[in-house]
Structure formats: C-alpha cells, structure tokens
C-alpha cells in the first residue's frame, strides 16, 4: 500500500513533535452494486478508494487528518500540521514495527472478480419474478446487490503493524403492495462478511416470500389505536431497538462525554434477570464481525449485560483510557476519512427460556410487532421512536388482525427493566449504523421478547 519506511517516518515525526501516540491507517477498497427496479437493471455502479489516515494523541486529545496522496513528503507535512494543534510534550522515539499475524475466521470461497455481470443480473431477475409471483397486488419490486472488498493496514508508535482484508456481500429486496388505502413496503436485507458464495447459496424463494407476504398483509391492515400497552417484539431485526436505544449509550464515545444514561452504572441492575446482552465481533461470516478492529486490536466477545446487571461498555483506545477499562476491540470507522471511535459489531439480546405462545397468551390487549422498520434515537437520553413494519393486534391472548401505522416510543433505559419474557429463537439481522466515525456494517438481533408496557403510537 505504502512503504514501511514511509510509515516509520510518519510515526517518528509525530512523536518528535510531542505527541504521545501516533497511528497510521491505510485503506484500499473497491465496491460495486447492481440495482433492479421495475423489472429493469436501472443502475450499475463501481468505485475504488485509496487513502491514508493519520492520528496523533496528546493525552486524551486526538487530532486526525487524511489524504489520498501517498507521497511521503505530503504525509510528513500532514503529520506536522496535525501536531501544531496539540499541546506539545517531550519528544520520544517509536517502537520498532513488528508485523503481527491476523487469524482470519471469515473465509471467502468465491472471489467476486471471477463472477460475470450476467450472473448477477440473472439473480436479481429471479428475485423480481419470485416476489411478484406471490400476488398481483405487488406493485413494485426493488432488488439490489452490494459487494465490497476492503484491505487495511494499521501501524502505530507502539510497534504495531497489521494488515487485514474484509469482503462484504449483501442483498436488499423491497416489495411494495397496494390494495386501496395507500402503498405498503416491506424489505429483507441479509448480508455477510464473505464472498460471492453468499449469493450462490441465498434462498431466493424464502426472502422473496417474506418480503411479498409482509407487504400484502399490511396492505390489508387497518390502523391501530395508540396508547400504553404490552408489546411482543419479533426476533431478528427487532433488536434494532436495543442497538439504537441501549447499544449506542453503552459505547465509551458516549460514556466519556457523560452523555449516556448508563454512566456510572457498571455493576448495577439495569434489567430483569432474564436479560443478557452481548456484543460479539468474532462470529464467523457475520455482517458486523471483524478479525481486528480499526485500531488493530483483535476482535472480542463482550458481555454488556448479564442476568440484568450492567457488566461492560464498548471501548476504543481513547474511551478505555478515559473510562479506565480494558479495550474491547470496538474501534471502527467507515473509511480512512474518519477517526476511529467505539462502535457496536454484532449486538444482540441472548436467548431466554420463554415461549412465543406463552407471551401472546399473557396479554389481553396489545401489539405483536413482528418486524421493525426505521426510526430515530437520542443517545444522550435513550429516547427512541421506531416504526413497526409488520404488526398485529393481540386480543384475549391470541394474535388478531394485522395493523399498520404503529410506532414504538420510549427511552431505552426505562424500557429495559420492562422486558419480562425472552424466547429461545434468537436471530441476527444485518444493518448499517451511522455515527461520528461514519457508516459501518453492524448486526442486530434478539429472540422474540415481551415488553410489559410501552407507548405505541397510532391513530
């Protein structure tokens, strides 16, 4: 990518200017996407990106810059400019760089470069045809394939030198159905950390059926009457609520700024004993997994909440230093254009022992939120608002009619203790998460669970 001699000179220059830590992040990536809309390939895109990010730490203060120009003189100048912003300390020398091996647990079986564009187009057409076969009220189908190959090199003044390759593959399918009272959209978006084999093994019929039937059911649905009520939250992407409303406030990026309701709560009970939550970056082939984080640390499994007790935060180098905890291998960034901060990887509520039937039977009137859509959250307060993509009324302990227009509104810190029943049907779902270090692949997940009371927005 760039010469090791150049990297060493950058590290030396940063420390000579008084920084106590200098880091170099080099990235070379390429991505492509194929998009089918209304039975036609309407967009094919590809891009390449190369650049270098340089970070200097002066105590707890970080200064970051980047360049797409690998010229040595340019990078030395950039390092010097960054150093001018810091509070200079004594000059030191970096440790000698020693290349470290990376254990790759994410095998790529089919190199995307060996696959023809025609094969990709044919797969998208199969998704379109399969989705439309589930009903004439399907008005529109959008199918998209995303592939990305990312190579990174990370070096720092403590002697670290490590390289890693990351291949991503994701399918996004949306179906729009309409039966009179406005269109309804449903989507499925599986993805992996892996190669083109993901697309050759994908279950076209299942994914198409799930999206089409969800859209068709909601097209027939009436509106729910809002209010505070018990909710059974479906597995898989239902975990987006924990991710957004509780996961972000557990990142040291929020904790160190005293911008989280979980500040100072380690060792305290924050949920009922049935709940254990985990962030695990080591699950093979999972969309949010990593061999190493974007500071070069091996990925880890971190128990966030165990039997209702808050056990850990998610930390990067700066966060771990300020919060006085070990690093959890959670430093992430979208690209070389962003400094790394603590971020989630594969974050999920673990399996419990309750059954779906028992959850439904325990409710006289409530909502079964089978599939969640998008929403928003304030990490400082944990306040969230999420749309329900597919929902059903619960009446007298049974699932009743489909309902549309429902939203779940609350505060993560307050909702956690109201989770009283957790099933044993854990599923994980791929997503993209945006924060101060850009958009990164993350996985959310949970078993089906019951929230005793939450505000449901409706009509």
Task: For the regions a language model picked out, list residue spans one by one.
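N-terminal small-residue-enriched
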Residues: 1-459
